């Protein structure tokens, strides 16, 4: 409902996108490369289609996070990087500005799937927010309930590296969490 111009995805929920179980076909390195190097991500989205029942099978795919970012931007009425700056970066008192890559100057779609370019100290602060139920320096930055739900092992199946996946985090057997991206990005 948030992105009506994209056809064929009406059975996919925001929670499915968060948990990488949308059923979208994204197999192969070429699709990964195409989404990363695309200069028009909104147009590229229409090349994807559902090939499995949404909500049934976990498979990490960048397109899930891209769609999630696009839906969030529609819901909040602003660029997700502006929202992150105001609601997290400023409230937590991060040490340095961060940037988020976009597909092109012409289309300016945030590449939500390939992370935030931030200083290590600020990434550590972000991790600390999650370690402390959404609090940093006594301030509630992220709702406690959201943080707790993030670690509920939504997907009962592990990926090839032995992680569960829940709300954009990888969860280990030791009840630890980590953000690991494509080809070992952290």
Where are the regions that the model predicts?
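Extracellular/periplasmic catalytic domains that process cell-envelope and extracellular macromolecules
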Residues: 8-12, 36-38, 51, 117, ...
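Structural helix-adjacent loops and short alpha-helical linkers that scaffold large soluble proteins
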Residues: 28-29, 73-85, 134-142
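Alpha-helical scaffold elements that line and support the substrate/ligand-binding pocket
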Residues: 1, 17, 45, 58-88, ...
